[in-house]
Amino acid sequence: MTQPPRIAIIGAGISGLAAAHALRDAARITLFEASDYFGGHAHTATIELPRSARDATPIAHGVDTGFLVYNDRTYPNLIRLFADLGVETALSEMSFSVQAARDNGGRLEWSGNNLSTVFAQRRNLADPRFLGMLADLLRFNRLTTRIAQAGTEGELAQPLGEFLDAHRFGAAFRDWYFLPMMGCIWSCSTAQMLAFPVATMIRFCHNHGLIQIANRPQWRTVRGGSRHYVEKIVAGLDDKRLRTPVRRITRTDEGVLVATDAGTERFDHAILATHSDQSLALLGDTSPAEAAVLGAIRYQPNHAVLHTDAAVLPQRRSAWAAWNYQRAVASERESGRVCLHYLLNKLQPLPWEQPVIVSLNPVDEIQRSQVMAEYDYDHPVLDLAAIRAQAEVPALQGQRNTWFAGAWMGYGFHEDGLKAGLAAAEGLRAHLSPIDAMARSPA
């Protein structure tokens, strides 16, 4: 009897998991993961804290440190996947706050929850720069909504910094709203954000309801942590290998050779569901086109700290939000990496009264006694070179039995990674002969 084809999937983030799940009944899948857990940015940590100040009963519960939320409008594939897997979800929110040093000393704090939190600092009511920021915010929303509805954003390849200057948006708007908001979305530095193409920003923000006051999407989170969907996918795979870094991939006339520390195995096809630079490093025989595309995407390293030190949040509790941006006092630190504090109690249903926070690139020292874990993540930088490279990816797919998948092919989010994994699986499935498919199908 004909053996079903062997497919190697390198990387067990959302893209690799999606591809493996989609192909599990069509081929013999081997899923390789270098780290000690499956999921990539879908990473849940179990921590134990007392229920409250009045009830010291310790409760262990999962919290997410990477992928946290999705919405009901722009994540159609993820919604279908969760429904198919029977994943339980809960309501979440996308509230946003800013902490920044004022030019004349002191500290600015505001949050976009409601009018009261916008003016959490009553002095902002009489601050011309702050009021100018709000006026610019409304003008920015009107302008970008008009551009998006006209469908002309694709013509705007200019960097964001030039766009803001050309339309005379003030420094307060840029530093106290726009760059903080973009930093929360893409987890990259101010210098990198100002180099983003305008089209990318407008299209994403319009689709996600970020530049409109009404009719915004509803955000949700996985109840108990994203590991629940990861575990359901992994449970359906026969051959999955943790702590098994792939060292080299070589394409031959007979298939694809995958080398690990345990030896070299031959597969009929391979899906590289890793960051583009990692895929480039794994391939020992890249074509000029592969080298050009995979080498065009840059990544921003970000250090995440899971902790309970609420001192990093705005001083006024009324200004606390789900996403809390803190501007570095030294501009050179701000231009290097963005600082964000995710208040998990607002993002996920947690059983503790105590604030639980993930701080990305903290600018202030966190009390070591309150640190529970630390992680490092890399996020794609979607500059013009990256956008151009994305357009060339389809021409690479299937060449020498190799496929690529990753969130770097889109906006860098969970839906983008899922979409890329499903697309790679669909393309590969089309290359399988009917005999291959029959060999895997149950009798």
Predicted regions and their residues:
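Mid-domain catalytic core of redox enzymes
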Residues: T2, P245-D378
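N-terminal Rossmann-like FAD-binding beta1-loop-alpha1 element of flavoenzymes
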Residues: P5-L31
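Conserved Rossmann-like nucleotide-cofactor binding loop
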Residues: S15, Y37, D277
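Glycine-rich FAD pyrophosphate-binding loop
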Residues: R24-E48
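Conserved FAD-binding subdomain of flavin-dependent enzymes
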Residues: T44, P50-S92
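Mobile amphipathic helical/loop "lid" adjacent to a hydrophobic cofactor/ligand pocket
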Residues: D72-V198, R203
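Conserved flavin/dinucleotide-binding core of flavoenzymes
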Residues: N113, V118, E334-A443
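Helical element adjacent to the flavin cofactor pocket in flavoenzyme catalytic cores
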Residues: R203-T260, E265
